[in-house]
Structure formats: structure tokens, C-alpha cells
């Protein structure tokens, strides 16, 4: 079982939430996503994915290249118990659920295209965390992704969860891992929200055609929370 003691350098925001540092709380984060996310937020939920479900293995954390993923064990030497424990925690970490955001404040046309997104949600780490209903959650771990030239098999749980290769560095990712209080056989797709987190919404300049008035009425969004795309002028009529 993964616990807060596996991340001794992390900041304890609450008894169930740890983050890489307290400075992250005020960090602005953005997420390119589908319009369905707005429907979900209105209904008090937020979609998450299990870590093991990502098709790209490099999205899992440390990518275990078969040519490099080994440990030197002397003949007749037993694998240290601590190493076995860490390996077990790393294995169990694939059952964690994830929510991936970017800390970039700059709207990016390539991100719009890569995610085929309808909307961009902008909020802060604190606003998002404070909106989550923690009743059925055992632990949330949040940190910035660190980017490195290569990814090697690690005995460090933090590196396993928050390291990626440099090819992904333009994402400037902040990731939330969620450990639910459910049985391993339970199917989970959503975080439950105890309140709607404060955010601003931008609609894709590449595909979104609804008028601003339609958007405000449909999702009960205050007009001041809808912002225009800077990529194409008058992206919202």
C-alpha cells in the first residue's frame, strides 16, 4: 500500500493529500478536454483514468526499457527486503487513478489539436483539490512532472510516478494521482465533487460554434468566467 511516508519530502496539505511543495497550491493549471467535462462538473463529478490504462507506456512514469531495466545482484545474494517492498508499491501504483493538467499559462494550438479538445479549463491546484469529495478517497498525490533525457527502472516511487522523458517537456504537466477506498475489482471513472471549483472556460477556436449566450445558458456559467481564445480573433461570436 502506498502511503504518505513514501514521499517524506512532500508537503502535507491534509491528512489525505500530499503535494510536491506548498508553492504548488497557487499554481494555475489548465486542461484541454471535451465539452462532456462541463456536463460532468455541473453534475458534481470529474473524469479520471487508471494509470495502467494509458496506451503510451511512457505515460506510466518510468519507462522500463528492457535493455536498461536491470539491477546488479551478486551471485547468491538475496534481493533486499526494502527493494522488494518498493517494487511491490510500484506495481500497485498502476492501480492509481490520474488527472493530468498543464501548468503552462499559454494557450497552445498544438495542444488543441493533439487532444481534439472542445474546451480549455483554467483553475488552480488549490481550487481543484478543495472541490474534491474525499469521503471515498484514501490518498491524493500531486506534483509537477520532471523531464529527463532517459528513463531508467527506479527504486524511487516519486520518480516512478513523476518522471517522463524530455520529448514530453512541452506539456509542462502537473499530475494528480488518486487512490480510492474501493476494492480492486470496482470500476471507477469519476472523482466526486463537493462543489464546483472556480475556473475560467475557453472554447476551442478550431471547432466550437455555439454562441456565448448559448454557452452561458446551457452550463450556467457566469459570463465573466468565459474567456476568448487568443489564437483566432472572435473565436466566440
Language-model features and meaning:
Residues 1-237:
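Partner-binding and oligomerization surfaces adjacent to conserved cores of proteins
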Amino acid at each position: 500500500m502506498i502511503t504518505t511516508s513514501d514521499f517524506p519530502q512532500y508537503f502535507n496539505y491534509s491528512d489525505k493529500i500530499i503535494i510536491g511543495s506548498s508553492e504548488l497550491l497557487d499554481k494555475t493549471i489548465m486542461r484541454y478536454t471535451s465539452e462532456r467535462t462541463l456536463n460532468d462538473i455541473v453534475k458534481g463529478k470529474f473524469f479520471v483514468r487508471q494509470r495502467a490504462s494509458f496506451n503510451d507506456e511512457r505515460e506510466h512514469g518510468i519507462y522500463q526499457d528492457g535493455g536498461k531495466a536491470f539491477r546488479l545482484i551478486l551471485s547468491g545474494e538475496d534481493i533486499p527486503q526494502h527493494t522488494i517492498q518498493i517494487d511491490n508499491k510500484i506495481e500497485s501504483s498502476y492501480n492509481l487513478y490520474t488527472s493530468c493538467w498543464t501548468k503552462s499559462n499559454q494557450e497552445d494550438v498544438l495542444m488543441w489539436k493533439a487532444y481534439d479538445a472542445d474546451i480549455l479549463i483554467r483553475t488552480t491546484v488549490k481550487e481543484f483539490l478543495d472541490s474534491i469529495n474525499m469521503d471515498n478517497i484514501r490518498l491524493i498525490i500531486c506534483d509537477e512532472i520532471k523531464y529527463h533525457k532517459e528513463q531508467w527502472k527506479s527504486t524511487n516511487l516519486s520518480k516512478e510516478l513523476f518522471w517522463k522523458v524530455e520529448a514530453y517537456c512541452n506539456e509542462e504537466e502537473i499530475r494528480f494521482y488518486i487512490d480510492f477506498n474501493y476494492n480492486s475489482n470496482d470500476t471507477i471513472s469519476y472523482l466526486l465533487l463537493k462543489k464546483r471549483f472556480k475556473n475560467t472556460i475557453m472554447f476551442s477556436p478550431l471547432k466550437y460554434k455555439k454562441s456565448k449566450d448559448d454557452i452561458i445558458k446551457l452550463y450556467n456559467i457566469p459570463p465573466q468566467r468565459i474567456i476568448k481564445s487568443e489564437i483566432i480573433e472572435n473565436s466566440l461570436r
